[in-house]
């Protein structure tokens, strides 16, 4: 058999097995008894962040990068990807101004969802950014001011009726009909969950009450009024607020205007999230001290998710810059994954983790120091893939208990 024919057969077999796997894993991911489930069985995962998917897919000539990452991730056993469903103003803007969209960019998001389905990867899609990257809440404030609305600071994003109206208008993207699959987003099981905001913070009220009472409840209720099939999460980093004062000692020395407990007790929020960047939050401390804090950070939130929230927990962003050395990053990731696995094995709420972040070949201009290209970083790739497989095996074992 020639090499060309053999390669064609292997490729065909891979696509057949992938199609069978995707069919077996069809259906919406739900929550039952504080854990994720799929088709009545426990669902545990290892996944990744790739915020750039829609931005790149807006140019059809660059879509191969999206395909590469999703295919390689699927091959490595990764089953969930978190990415942006927003780009407000600026280059390749999805939302050019309030309610005005670029169909070309929307079709990029359509492609991302279609490709994710093709490779059996579930998506967590975020509606807006805390930060100025890709617009964020600052862009919403600029739009309002440009329309003559008096806004004193960016944190009025959480309270001003005009700004909340703008966001609700964007949230209606859940009703879009995908131009490729011909399935409305709200009816597509490829989407695991919607996320209200990437890393909400409110410097005007460190207690977390403004974000909780004036914003999360209202936005969560609005999302569910449009789409009650998908899970919903806030997008929080996990900082504790005033609801349990002693828990604030777990924070890395400061508050950010959110409250992990109260923000996640809202009924419409289906699962809790935390993020962790020890090399940023604890800069200057030793690797050992950072790892010790990381273990405490994860366990504290796992305990609260299990005992107070009674909802699944996801480590939705974590990473360590490769500029500290590949070996240092591998040690860090192995430790984090071990903690996630052990807590998932202990029972209850730990659902999985999403490393920040996967890139395709030739995307050096996107590299923030945390980027991982599967295959180019073989030791890191092996660590990520091993975690994916043992989490899947654990889910299967739990299903047979």
UniProtKB/Swiss-Prot annotation:
It comes from the Eukaryota. Gene3D superfamilies: Glycosidases. Substrate binds at residues 84, 198, 277, 356. The active site is at residues 199, 317. One of its GO terms (molecular function) is mannan endo-1,4-beta-mannosidase activity. InterPro entries: Glyco_hydro_5 (IPR001547), Glycoside_hydrolase_SF (IPR017853), MAN-like (IPR045053). Its EC number is 3.2.1.78. GO terms for biological process: polysaccharide catabolic process. It is found in: Secreted. This is Mannan endo-1,4-beta-mannosidase 3. It comes from Solanum lycopersicum (Tomato).
